[in-house]
Structure formats: C-alpha cells, structure tokens
Amino acid sequence: MSNVVVIAVVLIVASLTGHVSAQMDMSPSSGPSGAPDCMANLMNMTGCLSYVTVGEGGGAAKPDKTCCPALAGLVESSPQCLCYLLSGDMAAQLGIKIDKAKALKLPGVCGVITPDPSLCSLFGIPVGAPVAMGDEGASPAYAPGSMSGAESPGGFGSGPSASRGSDAPSSAPYSLFLNLIIFPLAFAFYIFC
C-alpha cells in the first residue's frame, strides 16, 4: 500500500510541477511573451555597458564602437526590448546598475531613432519620463508618432519579434523533461522497493 501512495505523490508532484512552471511563464509580472527573447537581444548590446552603467567599468564619455550598430539592430528587430533595458530589471538580475539618464541619451548619441519610452507602459513596463539632457547636446531621438493610440501594443515594434507570440518559449519542454525523468524513477522505485 505504501508503494501506491509514493507513486501517487510522485505523479501529483510531477503534474503540479508542469502546471506551476506553465503558470510562471504566463504570469503578468514576467512581462510580455517576447521578454525571454529580449535577454539574448540585450546581450548583443554589451558594447553599450561602458556608457550606460554606473560603477566599475561604467561611466564612459561615449559608447564603444559596437554599441550604436547594436542599438540600431535592436530598434529594428525588437524595439520593445528597449523597455527592459530602460526599466533596469534585466540588468539588475545580472547585477548591473543602469544610469537611466545616460541610457535615455544613448539614441541621441548614436543617432538612432527610437520609439518614445513612455510607450513602454503599454507593455506594463514603466520606465519613467525622459530626463533633461546634459551639456553633451545630444537629445533623445524619439519618434513620438511611431505609435498612434489606435494601435495595439503589438504594433510597437514592426520587426519580426513583435509578432512572434507563438515563438515565445514555453514550459512544455521543461515539463516533458521532468515527466520523462520522474515517471521512470517512480516506476523503478515501485518495482525495486
């Protein structure tokens, strides 16, 4: 009888693990479905870190030569990822402190036109208002008309990433992997115990 109880508990835990991980992927606090793609996109912008970070390794007067092309590519392919950069949440997860004032100056310094940061609130990512630009004379290159009120948040980015709801990573492979491990272990435990 105890073997049946153990197997039942293992099966319930395995089922709940898949259900909980699926719920975590869909929780509003994790952001839009494109959020996981943003981490990879933001990693391409490491050349900008010396300019936009605070503390050791940061505070450069101008961005590295790889920064501006990376920013232009990010704006073209996944402009919503800029919201994650400006919010500082992803950087904080990596232990990086972003100077929001310099991050907001970056498009002007690079000569890249970006959507207005206030549009990030449409994704549920508040980034605050743009700050006054310093004496560098670089103003933010925002395209305030880049999204009319009639457009949905999916229209924020015209690139492929904005319409890839179906490409968002899911918990299915993780759940399948867990189930492929737990079920044979439970079966072996039942047979040998």
Swiss-Prot record:
Bilayer-crossing regions: none
Q: Which cysteines are joined by disulfide bonds?
A: C38-C83, C48-C67, C68-C110, C81-C120
The similarity comment for this entry is: Belongs to the plant LTP family.
Recorded source organism is: Arabidopsis thaliana
Q: Which InterPro entries match?
A: Bifun_inhib/LTP/seed_sf, Bifunc_inhib/LTP/seed_store, LTSS
Q: How does it sit in the membrane?
A: Lipid-anchor; GPI-anchor
Residues that make up the propeptide are 166-193
GO CC terms for this protein?
Answer: plasma membrane; side of membrane
Question: Sites of GPI-anchor amidated glycine lipid linkage?
Answer: G165
Q: Which Pfam families match?
A: LTP_2 (PF14368)
What does this chain do?
Lipid transfer protein that, together with LTPG1, binds to lipids and functions as a component of the cuticular lipid export machinery that performs extensive export of intracellular lipids (e.g. C29 alkane) from epidermal cells to the surface to build the cuticular wax layer and silique walls. Contributes to pre-invasive defense against some non-host powdery mildew pathogens by preventing the penetration of the epidermal cell wall by the fungal agents (e.g. Blumeria graminis f. sp. hordei (Bgh)).
Q: Which residues are glycosylated?
A: N44
Post-translational modification here is noted as: O-glycosylated on hydroxyprolines; noncontiguous hydroxylproline residues are glycosylated with arabinogalactan.
The protein depicted here goes by the name: Non-specific lipid transfer protein GPI-anchored 2
Compartments annotated for it: namely: Cell membrane
Q: Would I find Cytoplasm among this entry's keywords?
A: no
Molecular function per GO: lipid binding
| UniProt keyword Glycoprotein, yes or no | yes
Q: Could you tell me which residues belong to the region Disordered?
A: 143-164
Tissue distribution is: Up-regulated in the epidermis of top stems. Expressed in roots, cotyledons, seedlings, leaves, stems, buds, flower and silique walls. Preferentially expressed in the shoot apical meristem and the root meristem. Also detected in expanding leaves and petals, developing flowers, and elongating pistils, stamens and siliques.
Tell me the domain of life.
Eukaryota
Signal peptide span: 1-22
Which GO terms are recorded in the biological process aspect for this UniProt protein? Answer: cuticle development; defense response to fungus; lipid transport
CDD domains attached here? AAI_LTSS (cd00010)
Keywords, alphabetical? Cell membrane, Disulfide bond, Glycoprotein, GPI-anchor, Lipid-binding, Lipoprotein, Membrane, Plant defense, Signal
**If researchers knock out this gene, what phenotype do they report?**
Reduced cuticular wax load on the stem surface and in silique walls, with altered cuticular lipid composition (especially C29 alkane) associated with diffuse cuticular layer structure. Increased susceptibility to penetration of the epidermal cell wall by the non-host mildew fungal agent Blumeria graminis f. sp. hordei (Bgh). Some early aborted seeds and infertile ovules, and increased salt permeability in seeds.
Its gene name is LTPG2
